[in-house]
Amino acid sequence: MVKFNPPVIELESIGELQFQQEILTFEDISGSGFEPGKIIRYRLAFVYDGLCISPLTDVSWDHTVTGSDTQNIIVTVNINITMLHLVSRRITAVRLYAAEILEGTEQELFRLVKEIELDIHGFSLDPNSGLYTARVFDDGTRYASSIS
């Protein structure tokens, strides 16, 4: 009888996913969400089995709102889904959280911006990069974040 031992995934694998700066990219668009010069810090969390939510990532992605008028932010989440499943096949979604920053410190608790299912409805394949991408609209809404 041949015993199958699945590959062992070290916890550093999760860190490798988190430290890639291109996981989140940003675009400012006209809107009423954020004043020019505001710094918004984003973090991710993973959803396991559709129920359990991991702690927020240690790594964060900061974005400074540009322009002379108020702006909303489109955050593009770029993920190699295959790599996520190497970490854990139980990951079913990714959650994007945000907080405003002043002098390097979060001025509020992180708010849920959106939960994105790891399926064809949440992510689409970018043939140029080979990564799965999802675009998330952030207008700074608090206490009423959309999960759909």
Give names to the regions the model predicted.
Residues 1-148:
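Disordered, low-complexity "stalk" and linker segments at domain junctions of extracellular
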